[in-house]
Amino acid sequence: MASASYHISNLLEKMTSSDKDFRFMATNDLMTELQKDSIKLDDDSERKVVKMILRLLEDKNGEVQNLAVKCLGPLVSKVKEYQVETIVDTLCTNMLSDKEQLRDISSIGLKTVIGELPPASSGSALAANVCKKITGRLTSAIAKQEDVSVQLEALDIMADMLSRQGGLLVNFHPSILTCLLPQLTSPRLAVRKRTIIALGHLVMSCGNIVFVDLIEHLLSELSKNDSMSTTRTYIQCIAAISRQAGHRIGEYLEKIIPLVVKFCNVDDDELREYCIQAFESFVRRCPKEVYPHVSTIINICLKYLTYDPNYNYDDEDEDENAMDADGGDDDDQGSDDEYSDDDDMSWKVRRAAAKCLDAVVSTRHEMLPEFYKTVSPALIARFKEREENVKADVFHAYLSLLKQTRPVQSWLCDPDAMEQGDTPLTMLQSQVPNIVKALHKQMKEKSVKTRQCCFNMLTELVNVLPGALTQHIPVLVPGIIFSLNDKSSSSNLKIDALSCLYVILCNHSPQVFHPHVQALVPPVVACVGDPFYKITSEALLVTQQLVKVIRPLDQPSSFDATPYIKDLFTCTIKRLKAADIDQEVKERAISCMGQIICNLGDNLGPDLSNTLQIFLERLKNEITRLTTVKALTLIAGSPLKIDLRPVLGEGVPILASFLRKNQRALKLGTLSALDILIKNYSDSLTAAMIDAVLDELPPLISESDMHVSQMAISFLTTLAKVYPSSLSKISGSILNELIGLVRSPLLQGGALSAMLDFFQALVVTGTNNLGYMDLLRMLTGPVYSQSTALTHKQSYYSIAKCVAALTRACPKEGPAVVGQFIQDVKNSRSTDSIRLLALLSLGEVGHHIDLSGQLELKSVILEAFSSPSEEVKSAASYALGSISVGNLPEYLPFVLQEITSQPKRQYLLLHSLKEIISSASVAGLKPYVENIWALLLKHCECAEEGTRNVVAECLGKLTLIDPETLLPRLKGYLISGSSYARSSVVTAVKFTISDHPQPIDPLLKNCIGDFLKTLEDPDLNVRRVALVTFNSAAHNKPSLIRDLLDSVLPHLYNETKVRKELIREVEMGPFKHTVDDGLDIRKAAFECMYTLLDSCLDRLDIFEFLNHVEDGLKDHYDIKMLTFLMLVRLSTLCPSAVLQRLDRLVEPLRATCTTKVKANSVKQEFEKQDELKRSAMRAVAALLTIPEAEKSPLMSEFQSQISSNPELAAIFESIQKDSSSTNLESMDTS
C-alpha cells in the first residue's frame, strides 16, 4: 500500500512539470494505475489525485487535457463518495466558464462520470447523490438561455443522465420538465432537437403526473398552432415520446391522431414528413390504440407515396433512364441532407410514407388480404421512384409484405382456404406479372443499391411462392447476367445476384432453364474463378444447382448437357485442388464436384479417377472430411453407377476409423456412406474392409444416442441382405449390444423399427449360432432365468415385437413357439414376468399371423384377465385385441359378445376393442362398424370415467372409418340428456383430429363449432373436455378452429376465472383442507391459451389475452407455472404489447419471488415454492430481453430487490447462464 502511495505521489509531482511530455507520460501512467483492480488509495492520496486531475483539465496542452478526462472514468469507481462530489461540483462550475475549451472538456468529463456510475437498478447511493447534484446545476444552465453552446452541452448531459439514471431522479422530474418545455420554442433548432431527445428519455422513467403534464402541454400548443415552425417541433416531440414510451402515449392517440391528420393537409413538406413519421411511431409502438386509425394512416401514406409535384412521370416505358435522374451509382446509404434538388423536399415525404407503410405491413398480420388489395399494387407502381433512397424504402416495404406472407403457419397453406381464392398467397400469385414487369426495368439500372433491392425482392418472392417465376425466367435471366458481367458491379451485388439465381434454380423445374443454360454458364464459371472468396463460394453453390438442372437424374430429360461439362468441371476442379483457399470455398468445391460426378460422371473419362484421388486426400483432412463423406455418399447413390473401385481399398478403412471419432455428425454421415456403399458396391468390397467397419460398431449401439444406434442397425441390416457371409463376426460384442438395446426402455420409434428389420434380415441368412431358436433364446432368456428380471415394462413390449418379427420371417417355427407361449400363460408356476412376455408375444405374433387354429387361446387369455397383476391383465387385454386383428371374423364378434356378457371385465375388453379399431384395416372393420357403434353407445353413459374415456377413443377412431355417416351421429348426441354421454362424444371428437390431412377434415371443419358449443354446457366436466378437445384442434390442426375464435374465446376466457362457489372445505381428521373443483377446468383453459400463442397469434386481441394472463399470475401453483411460460413466449412474440402492461405484470411476479414458506411446512412445499421462484425468474429474465423493459421504474426497482437478495440473485444468475448456454447450443449446427 505504502509503495503504491509513493509511486502515485511521484506521478503527481511529475504532473506539475513545465514539460508537457512529462505531464502527459505521468497522466498516462496514473491512468494505468487507476485501471488496476488492486489499487487502494488512502484519503490523502485520493484528495491529491482528484485535485491534480481537475487541475489538468485546464492544462494548456490538449492531449494532456484529453488524458485527464479519460482518467475520470476509473477514478470515480476508486475514490470515496465525497471526492466524486468534488469532481462533479468542479465540472459543473467549469461548464459555465467563459473559456470555450474548458467548457467542452468539462462537459465531456461529466458524461464520462455519468457513464461510470453504477446503473439505477443496482440501488447505488453514489449514483443517486451524484445525479441529484448535477441535475440542479444543469436545469439552471438550460433555463438561462444565455449561451447556446452551454445550453446544448447541458441538454446533451441531461439526456444522457435521464437515459442511464432516470429512475433515481423522480423527485427532480417536475423541475426538469419545467426547464425543458420552454426550450421547444427556442429560436435555435439545435436546442429544440436536443430538448426533444431529453424529453424522450424523461418519459421512460417519469411518473404519471409529469407525463400527463407534458402531453397536455403538447396537445394544447398543437391546438393553438401559433407558428408552423413550433408546430413542426411539437409533432416531432410527440413522435419521439411515442418511440420511447409508446405504451404510455397510447391512451392519448384519440386526441393526437386527428390533429396530426389535420396537419398532413397543410402545404408544408417538412411538416408532412414529421406527421407521417409520427404515424409510423404510433403504428409500431401503440398497436392496440392505433388500430381504429390504421385505414386512415394507410390512405394518407398511399396518397403521399406518389407525391412528386416537381416531376412528370409521363409514360414510364418511353424513357428508360428516367429512373435514375441523378445518374449516380453511389452505393452509400444517403443521409437526410442528400437530395437531387435543393428546393425539392417532396422526396422526404415519399420516403416517410414508404417507411410508415413498412411499419403497418410489419405489425398488422391480420390485414394481409387488405394489403394485397391496396398497398401491394401501390408499392409495385412505385418501384419506378426516381430518388434512390426512397426507392430503397419502397422495396423494403414490399419485402416486409412478402415476409409477412411466408407460409410458416399451417393455416396459410390450408387447402380449404386456398380454394376460396382470396388468401394472401393467391393474391400475391396474381400480382407476380406486375412485380416482374416493374423489376425488369430496374435490374438494368446503373445504381448498385437498386439492383441489390431487386435481387432481394426476387429471392423473397420465390421463398414465399416457389415456382412463381416459371413464366418469367426469360425476362429475368438477362438482368441477372447483366450484374454478373458488369465490371462496375460491387462484390456484394454479385453475391446477391448469385444468391438470387441459386434460390430461383432450387425452386423451379429444370426444364424452365434449359433455353438459358448457354447464357448462364459463362458468367457463373467466371464467378467461380473470382479472386474474392465470398463470390467463389456463392458461385459454387449455383454451379452445383446448375449441374442438377442440365442433367436431372430424377426425371427424363432430352437436354444435351455435353457442351457445358468441360467448363463446369474445369472451374470446379481448379478450386478443389487449391490448398490455400477459404474453408467455406473448400467445402463447397467438394460438394459441387460431388454433384458433378453424381450427375455427369459417365462423361468425365480419365478425369474421374484423378478427381476421386483428390477426394481421398480431402477425406484424410480433419477440416474437410465431413463434407467429403457427404459428397461420396451422393456419388455412391448415383444411378450412373460411378466406378469407385480405385478409392474403395484405401477409403473404406478411413471411413471405418471415423466411427470412433467424437463427432456425432461425422459418425452419422459415415454410417450413411457405408450403408449406400454396401448396397451398391458389395462386389468391390473385401471381407477385410467390412471387418474393419464391424470392429468399430459395438460402441455405437447404445441407448445414449438412439439416432446413431438406428443408423448402425440399418447398416447391419443392409449387410445381412447384401453380404450375409460377413455376419458370422457379429455374434460377439455387437450382438450383446443389440440385445442390451432391445431391453432398454428408450428403444422405440425409428430405432425399434430398424431393430425389427435387422432381426428379420439376420434370421434368414442361416448364419451359424444365429438361427431362429438361438436368437429367441437370447431375446427371452433373461425373463425365464429369474436372476435378471427386467425392470421396465417397455422392455417386454420390445422383446415381444422382436419375437414376432423373427416368427414372421420363419413362419414354420410359429406354431411351436405359440404353443409354448400358451403353456407359459397357463402354467401356474410361471412368474408374472414370464406371463407378461408370453401374452405380449402372442399379441404381436397374432397381429400378423392368424392364430385361430390355437383352440385354447381365447380361454387362456380370458383366464389371464383374472390375474392379480395389473400388468398381466393389461397385457392380456392388448394381446386379445392384437390377435383379433389377425383374424377379425373369428375374434371380433367374440370380443363384442364378451363385452356384453362380462361386465366385470368390461374395462379390459374395451381396451382390446380399442386396439382392434386402432390397428385393423378400414376394409376389414367396415362390416362390423354398426355392431361396434351400437355397443359403444350403450357404454358412453358409464359413470366410471376411465371406461368412458376408452369408449370415447373407440368412438372417435371408429368415426374415422366412415366419417360421412358417423360424424353426424356423434353430433346428434350433443343434445343427450346425460352429461356423461355429452362428455363422451366431445372427447371422441378429440380422437378424430390429427396433425396430418385426413378425409374427415372438411366435414370436421363444418361441424366442430357445434361440438365446441358445449363450452356453454351447464356441466363442469363437459366444459372441461370441450376445452381439451379445443386444445387438441388448436395444436394439431389450427385451420379447424381459426374462424371460430371470435365466438369461442369469450367462453374460453370465462373459464380462467376462479369461482368461489366451486371451492369447498373438507375435514380430514383435525385438519380442514380446501378443495377447488374448478382448478382442472381453469388449467385446461390456460393450456388452450398457451397453445393459441403458437398456432393462432394473429387472431388474438393480445391485450384482452394479457388481462387473463395477469389473473393467472395470481392463481394456483399449476396455473402460475403455465402463465410464467406464457410470459416467456409473449416476450418474444409481442414485446411491445407486453411492454405496455409491464407494470401490471411485475407485481404478481415480485409477490411470487418474495413469498416465504411457513417454517413447519413439509419438504414438498419448499420444493414447490422453489420451482415457482425459478419459473417466475425465467419470466423476469424473458421480460428483460424486451428493449426498454429495464427503464420501467417498477421493473428497475424489482431488479434492485433481486440483486440485493442473495437467494434471488443466485437463482437469477443461474437462469441467465442457462439461457446463454442454450443459445450457444442452438447455434451449434453439427
Curated annotation (Swiss-Prot):
Residue numbers spanned by region Disordered: 315-344
HEAT repeat start and end residues: 2-39, 44-81, 83-119, 131-165, 171-208, 210-247, 248-282, 289-366, 370-407, 424-467, 471-510, 515-552, 563-602, 606-643, 646-683, 688-725, 729-768, 770-808, 809-845, 852-889, 890-927, 928-960, 961-998, 1002-1039, 1043-1097, 1099-1133, 1140-1189
GO biological process, one term: negative regulation of catalytic activity
N6-acetyllysine sites (modified residues): K971
Modified residues annotated as N-acetylalanine in this record: A2
InterPro entries named in the record: ARM-like, ARM-type_fold, CAND1/CAND2, TATA-bd_TIP120
Record keywords: Acetylation, Cytoplasm, Nucleus, Phosphoprotein, Repeat, Ubl conjugation pathway
Listed GO MF terms: TBP-class protein binding
Modified residues (Phosphoserine): S335, S558
This protein's record includes keyword Isomerase: no
One cellular component (GO) term of this entry: ubiquitin ligase complex
Location of this chain's protein in the cell: Cytoplasm; Nucleus
Gene3D superfamilies according to UniProt: Leucine-rich Repeat Variant (1.25.10.10)
Location (main, coarse): cytoplasm
Similarity remark: Belongs to the CAND family.
Function: Key assembly factor of SCF (SKP1-CUL1-F-box protein) E3 ubiquitin ligase complexes that promotes the exchange of the substrate-recognition F-box subunit in SCF complexes, thereby playing a key role in the cellular repertoire of SCF complexes. Acts as a F-box protein exchange factor. The exchange activity of CAND1 is coupled with cycles of neddylation conjugation: in the deneddylated state, cullin-binding CAND1 binds CUL1-RBX1, increasing dissociation of the SCF complex and promoting exchange of the F-box protein. Probably plays a similar role in other cullin-RING E3 ubiquitin ligase complexes.
Subunit structure comment from the entry: Interacts with TBP. Part of a complex that contains CUL1 and RBX1. Interacts with unneddylated cullins: interacts with CUL1, CUL2, CUL3, CUL4A, CUL4B and CUL5. Does not bind neddylated CUL1. Interaction with cullins is abolished in presence of COMMD1, which antagonizes with CAND1 for interacting with cullins. Interacts with ERCC6. Interacts with DCUN1D1, DCUN1D2, DCUN1D3, DCUN1D4 and DCUN1D5; these interactions are bridged by cullins and strongly inhibits the neddylation of cullins.
Protein name (database record): Cullin-associated NEDD8-dissociated protein 1
